Design a protein with these regions (language model features):
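Short beta-strand scaffold segments in enzyme catalytic cores
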Residues: 29, 53-57, 174-178, 184, ...
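Anionic-ligand binding region
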Residues: 181-252, 257
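ATP-binding N-lobe of GHMP and related small-molecule kinases
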Residues: 2-129, 147-157, 199, 208
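Glycine-rich, charge-dense phosphate/pyrophosphate-binding loop(s)
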Residues: 2-7, 19-21, 97, 103-106, ...
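Alpha/beta catalytic cores of group-transfer enzymes, especially the acyltransferase/condensing modules
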Residues: 154-213, 274, 291, 301
């Protein structure tokens, strides 16, 4: 084994790497009681949609002595959907993802591990909409940073898929699925994933609400609703199972899938934003097979019979004034992956 395989090459191969990761809808989201750690036990079916985030991680020119409190200075730019709402600071999951890979690069003695970086996010997923836009940023950043700092796939120091999944779970419950893509059943906080085989393509109209909803706030509202009606609360893991939904997905039957969409967070989301009920009604009147609050909301995902139907439903909901914006998408979509590499030139 060569020295470069152990310690890494002395110079970077790529100036920048761009990766993409897709958003998601929860076709089934069963929520158990709050655990001692504050999280809730989930039983969910994720499906990746064609809406995606693209994240570019680029090395910056060396800038001499660096502040030891900030050994990897980072600059930012964001474009695309809701770009003005994206935090451009260390609270951003993409930044945390890059920092995690930089730590591995330092441990592996990668020569450019302490170089400054520029992160650019091109957004295609609504912010704070329950479709895992921030988690997709993190997943794409993990893939891009891994390729940037560990360009040799043969390197034993390069993090493998299992290690990336562990890092992803530390970043957020939805990040592992955004790495995986496709369709999967998630348990625990949603990070324990079992891929689900499906047939066909599913078409969606998406309705956003610019007011957004805080995920912790929606879970808190669910807990309060259950405390007020304890007879309706699950005693252990979520009552009910998504097995029938999995069967419908395997058969590729959108009409049957529509009957089986479940989201325990829909009621608390509607109680916080009552106008969501009107959006759901407008979707039904426009001819959607079914409509559901996506994740913790407030985005509404409307399952349609075809791509043309999705356009018609999105248009009808928009014309009715029941959404801040509408768009169409399809599912399932692929795993996170590299889409562009810019090599360093002499």
């Amino acid at each position: 084994m060569s020295v470069s395989h152990i310690f890494g090459p002395p110079e970077p191969k790529y100036r920048s790497v761009t990766a993409s990761a897709h958003g998601k809808v929860n076709l089934h989201l069963g929520v158990g009681p709050a655990r001692e750690d504050g999280y809730h036990e989930l039983d969910t079916i994720f499906q990746a949609v064609s809406l995606k985030e693209e994240v570019t991680v680029a090395l910056r020119e060396a800038q001499g002595a660096q502040d030891t409190a900030d050994p990897t200075p980072c600059t930012w730019s964001v474009s695309g959907f809701d770009s003005h709402l994206v935090p451009q600071d260390p609270s951003n999951l993409a930044w945390k993802a890059v920092a995690a890979i930089q730590d591995l690069a330092r441990d592996a003695h990668v020569a450019w591990a302490d170089a400054g970086v520029h992160i650019h996010i091109d957004k295609g997923i609504p912010v704070a909409g329950g479709m895992a836009g921030g988690s997709a940023d993190a997943a794409a950043a993990l893939i891009a940073a891994t390729e940037l700092y560990f360009p040799d796939p043969r390197s034993p120091r390069r993090p493998d898929s299992a290690q990336l999944s562990e890092i992803a779970a530390d970043l957020g419950a939805d990040v592992p699925f955004c790495l995986l893509g496709g369709t999967a059943r998630g348990t625990g906080k949603g990070e324990n994933l079992m891929p689900v085989i499906t047939q066909g393509t599913y078409h969606w109209a998406i309705a956003t609400d610019k007011r957004g909803l805080s995920t912790p706030q929606v879970f808190k509202q669910l807990d309060q609703q259950r405390a007020a009606a304890p007879e309706a609360s699950p005693k252990g893991a979520r009552v009910g199972s998504p097995e029938a939904l999995i069967t419908a997905l395997r058969a590729g039957n959108p009409a049957e899938v529509g009957k089986l969409l479940v989201n325990d967070l829909q009621a608390p989301a509607i109680s916080l934003l009552p106008n969501l009920r009107e959006t759901l009604k407008a979707a039904e009147e426009a001819g959607a097979i079914a409509a559901i609050v996506s994740g913790s909301g407030p985005t509404i995902a409307m399952l349609c019979a075809s791509a043309d139907d999705a356009v018609e439903v999105a248009t009808a909901v928009s014309v009715a004034g029941k959404a801040s914006s509408t768009m169409t998408t399809s599912s399932p979509a692929a795993a996170a992956g590299v889409i562009k590499r810019e090599e360093v030139r002499e």
